[in-house]
Amino acid sequence: MDKPNNIIICVGRQLGSGGQIIARKLAEEFGCKLYDREILNLAAKESGFSEKIFEQNDEHKGFFRALLSGHGRSFAINNFYQNEFSEENLFQFQADAISKAASEGPCVFVGRCADYVLRDVEGVVSVFITADMGERISRVMERKQCDEETARHIIENGESQRATYYNYYTGKKWGNAASYDLCVNSSRLGIDGATALIAEFIRKSSPTSQTCPTSPTRPTSSQQS
């Protein structure tokens, strides 16, 4: 089947919704590269900072406040003044890495405000994946090998961080339908059904239809959603 040319898909997701799995399947469907935590590695290479710094600040606003209140106070202060190191700078390095990756060909991004960073790029489709709370809790319990209460806490804490991060940098509201081109509840259709629906939406909304150059998807280390 013909596929949209130069497609860029940005996938936002609730924790435990299966969004990362759907993103991988979309990358396979359209022959695109998949960028999840790989963006942190690219940002680290471009900036010269350690990838660990980007990991600790990943979709988490307030990283420096935590450092300054703990044992990392001296480290944080020294790096801030000596390297003009701040959360906003980290976000910009990451945004630059996203823009560079998007310029190199068709790809799928998971989270990290990619939909906002690429808002002026032609062919970008933004999708948000949600799911029923019970299913999300079950998925997190299985992945983390924890009880229901712990899984619920992981979801609530993780989503609070994601929402704060997204809202701050984009000026939009995380998870609000108005912030995306398409919102899908994976509990209604299942992972494969949700993937098929999104793929069909992308094909129908694309102004051109042409086979994408096939690129192997990159393995992801994140299994959080």
Regions found by a protein language model. Give the residues of each.
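Pre-Walker A (Motif I) flank of P-loop NTPase domains
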Residues: P4-R13, G105
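Glycine-rich phosphate-binding P-loop
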Residues: V11-R24
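Conserved phosphate-donor/acceptor-positioning beta-strand/loop module used by diverse small-molecule
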Residues: D120-E142, E148-N157
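Short beta-strand-centered segment that lines the nucleotide-binding/catalytic pocket of NTP-utilizing
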Residues: K33-A44
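Small-molecule kinase domains that catalyze NTP-dependent phosphoryl transfer to phosphate-bearing small molecules
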Residues: K61-R73, D147-D192
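RNA pseudouridine synthases
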Residues: A101, C107, C113-V121
